[in-house]
């Protein structure tokens, strides 16, 4: 009886295991855009840059925060002891801008870009 219980328990554990990759090990950049800005811009990201294009006919004031993470998902700290780099810029109608995504540490593997 014990033997059957152990076999059944083993099958249940195998069935419950997941082969999906954990998000902390993802190498795909994370992009967050506020709902009011999202329909007005187009964004393309790579590991080294992000290109933001103003699709609207109005001048946009865009602020962003850039967070970098190591291979375990731990936030990397910038030289000034901040967890993110922040900046803002203006985009004229139909204009596009490229943001260079400088890594704060050699351990930095993936980033999250938050646009608002």
Curated annotation (Swiss-Prot):
Q: What keywords is this UniProt entry annotated with?
A: Signal
PROSITE patterns for the chain: PROKAR_LIPOPROTEIN
What CDD domains does the record point to? DUF1425
Signal sequence: where?
A: 1-15
Spans traversing the lipid bilayer: none
Q: Would I find Signal among this entry's keywords?
A: yes
- What is the top-level taxon of the source organism? Bacteria
Protein name per Swiss-Prot or TrEMBL: Uncharacterized protein HI_0960
Origin species, per record, is: Haemophilus influenzae (strain ATCC 51907 / DSM 11121 / KW20 / Rd)
